Each structure stands twice: as C-alpha cells, then as structure tokens.
C-alpha cells in the first residue's frame, strides 16, 4: 500500500524531541527519513523511562516512540567532513528539518546555497539568536 509521502526524502538534523517528533510524522506517512545524530548521545536517547529503570542508549521510551521508521547516521555537523556528508545527503533530499543552534544552522544552510537561492527546502524547529 502506498503512503501519502512515498518518494519524499527528508533529512533530520539534531537530537531534540521536537525534531525527532517532526521526522517521525514524515516517516509515518511514508517519507524516507535519515536522522543525523550528533556524536554525543542525543537528548532523545537520554529521556526516561527505561526498562527496569536502567539507562540504555537504544531502549528509552521516547527514543523508541520518535525514532522508528527512520534510517540513522552519526555525523558531527561542526566538522568539515561532517558538513560534506550532510551536503551529499541533503543534495538528494526534498526537505531538511533541524533543531540546532542558529549559528550552526546558518553554517549548514550556506552549504546548500547556489548563488542567492537555496537548493533544498529547510525548516528550523526552534528559532534561536545567532
């Protein structure tokens, strides 16, 4: 059975609940979502409850609720090599959603610019001061 968003490619950047929930909605409706997680443990993976109240990076209820139906890769978006990976993935995406500090988001947005126009659609979840 086809889904409404079949064929849509979405890149999710950041480890917060808001970006994970947004990405989950796209995935639930058939989009191909690639979650780019930070090298440090993301916020979503740290949130309890955990089975038997014992922390485990892959077993938190919030992570299991919001990070299913996605592919995942760990990338440091602050490094040049990380930006290259994100540029390659993002160049094939229809949409990029991110919840990272504004200065970091602006750096990433600039890698998708072609002159004065963006090459892909980008949505930032939480506006923050630069």
For the regions a language model picked out, list residue spans one by one.
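N-terminal helix-loop segment corresponding to the beta1-alpha1 unit
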Residues: 1-130
């Amino acid at each position: 059975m086809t889904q409404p968003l079949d064929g849509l490619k979405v890149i999710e950047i950041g480890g917060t609940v808001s970006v994970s929930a947004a990405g989950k909605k796209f995935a639930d409706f058939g989009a191909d979502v690639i979650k780019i997680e930070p090298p440090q443990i993301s916020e979503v993976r740290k949130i309890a409850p955990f089975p038997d109240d014992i922390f485990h990076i892959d077993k938190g209820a919030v992570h299991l609720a919001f990070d299913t139906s996605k592919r995942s890769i760990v990338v440091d978006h602050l490094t040049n090599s990380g930006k290259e990976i994100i540029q390659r993935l993002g160049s094939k995406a229809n949409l990029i959603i991110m919840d990272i500090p504004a200065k970091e988001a602006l750096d990433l947005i600039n890698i998708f610019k072609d002159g004065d126009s963006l090459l892909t659609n980008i949505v930032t979840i939480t506006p923050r001061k630069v």
